[in-house]
UniProtKB/Swiss-Prot annotation:
This is Conotoxin Gm9.1. It is found in: Secreted. Belongs to the conotoxin P superfamily. Its main location: secreted. The keyword Lyase does not apply.
Amino acid sequence: MHLSLARSAVLMLLLLFALGNFVVVQSGLITRDVDNGQLTDNRRNLQTEWNPLSLFMSRRSCNNSCQSHSDCASHCICTFRGCGAVNG
């Protein structure tokens, strides 16, 4: 039983990686408005935050410092260490 479950999990992971494209969405900040108590969404349009990922390593560098994903090249994302390749 456990072996079958493990095989299923491995198969699912292989299928995910075989697709080759994943989506990273930068989560934004949702706050409560002080005046009327309603929730406000301070995120930009999420469509602009999608970055396709690939299984293949990028040979381009991502050495910039950053505050947001828009500060990095298209193949990079902003991390706590600066711009980094989306696939590692």
